[in-house]
């Protein structure tokens, strides 16, 4: 029984292989063959239709409408982007805040604007202080030690109220007196030196012995 089944399977496989070989070895119908010429003669319209160009859409209204809408949307997006950039780049000045405060209606907006105005005032003061500090540091770095010391002394004098006119005159008088006293001291020292240098007779101290 198994042998019969095996023989049937082998037989069917051989038939299938032969059929495939026939198909592969079969010649293709050439254009110049009788069958090809007969088919062309029977169906001339098919050849004409195959040679015709492909039909194209002539109605372009839909495409134009879409492109116009797209361009309009892009233009609006560009304009809104520029407006947002300009709003972000603008700084709120004191005058602009005051005008907005005057035109504000609700109390909440008024309170917010008052806070913003106070903040801008403080910020302006801080900016001015930082600018002056930066200039002072640059000048001190460029200048020498003598000029920096002089500027520090002037600033300290200005902070302490400055030197009074009487103090200045007293200091000038003391300086003049010191200048006058210096040559007198030198003269007295010179006289002392001359006195010390004069020779003294040591035998003059002894008593005179008179012979009688």
Curated annotation (Swiss-Prot):
Keywords: Cytoplasm, Nucleus, Phosphoprotein, Ribosome biogenesis, Transport. The keyword Transmembrane does not apply. InterPro entries: Pre-60S_factor_ECM1, Ribosome_bgen_Alb1. GO terms for cellular component: cytoplasm; nucleolus; nucleus; preribosome, large subunit precursor. It is found in: Nucleus, Nucleolus; Nucleus; Cytoplasm. Residues 191-201 have a biased composition (Polar residues). Residues 28-48, 188-212 are annotated as: Disordered. The keyword Ligase does not apply. GO terms for biological process: ribosomal large subunit export from nucleus. Pfam families: Alb1. Belongs to the ECM1 family. Associates with the pre-60S ribosomal particle and the nucleopore complex. Pre-ribosomal factor involved in 60S ribosomal protein subunit export from the nucleus. Present with 2840 molecules/cell in log phase SD medium. This is Shuttling pre-60S factor ECM1.
């Amino acid at each position: 029984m198994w042998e019969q089944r095996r023989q049937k399977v082998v037989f069917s496989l051989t038939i299938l292989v032969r059929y495939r070989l026939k198909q592969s070895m079969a010649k293709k119908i050439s254009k110049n063959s009788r069958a090809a010429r007969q088919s062309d003669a029977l169906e001339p319209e098919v050849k004409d239709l195959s040679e015709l160009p492909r039909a194209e859409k002539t109605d372009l209204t839909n495409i134009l409408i879409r492109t116009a809408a797209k361009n309009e949307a892009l233009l609006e997006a560009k304009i809104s982007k520029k407006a947002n950039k300009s709003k972000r780049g603008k700084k709120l000045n004191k005058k602009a805040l005051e005008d907005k405060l005057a035109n504000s209606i609700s109390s909440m907006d008024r309170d917010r604007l008052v806070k913003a105005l106070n903040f801008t005032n403080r910020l302006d003061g801080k900016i001015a202080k930082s600018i002056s500090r930066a200039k002072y540091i640059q000048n001190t770095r460029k200048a020498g030690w003598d000029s920096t010391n002089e500027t520090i002394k002037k600033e300290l004098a200005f902070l302490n109220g400055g030197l009074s006119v009487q103090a200045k005159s007293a200091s000038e008088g003391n300086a003049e007196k010191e200048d006058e006293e210096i040559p007198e001291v030198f003269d007295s020292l010179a006289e002392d030196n001359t006195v010390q240098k004069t020779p003294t007779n040591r035998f003059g101290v002894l008593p005179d012995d008179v012979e009688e």
